[in-house]
């Protein structure tokens, strides 16, 4: 039988770890665990997101096959959340693939989807 692993963190390559840690801590309600020039981390006690400095990283084209990864978040009011996230530095790509959720890009161009809570 295969040993089951527990996911403890996802690490995101970026040019400015401190900036992205603050952005995601704000929209997810996580605490900044540490923030340095090379590495930063946020978490909620169960899972963490780490940000690793990779200055040569280039944002993926959207839409396109090289988007690398994206996060999905659930919110009670998609329109309200999107407006708040845009004010925090997110961007809204022109191409939106469907209705009911919105694709945004964080301040460094990583894509994430803002999805409604399930009823």
What are these regions (language model features)?
Residues 1-34, 43-93, 105-119:
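Glyoxalase I/VOC metalloenzyme domain signal
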């Amino acid at each position: 039988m295969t040993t089951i692993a527990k996911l403890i963190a996802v690490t995101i390559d970026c040019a400015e770890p401190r900036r992205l840690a603050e952005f995601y801590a704000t929209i997810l309600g996580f605490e900044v665990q540490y923030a340095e020039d090379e590495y930063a981390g946020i978490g909620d006690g169960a899972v963490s997101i780490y940000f690793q400095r990779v200055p040569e990283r280039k944002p993926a084209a959207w839409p396109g096959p090289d988007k690398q990864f994206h996060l999905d978040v659930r919110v009670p009011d998609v329109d309200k959340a999107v407006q708040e996230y845009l004010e925090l530095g997110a961007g809204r790509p022109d191409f939106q693939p469907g209705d009911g959720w919105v694709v945004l890009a964080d301040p460094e161009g990583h894509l994430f989807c803002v999805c409604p809570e399930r009823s």
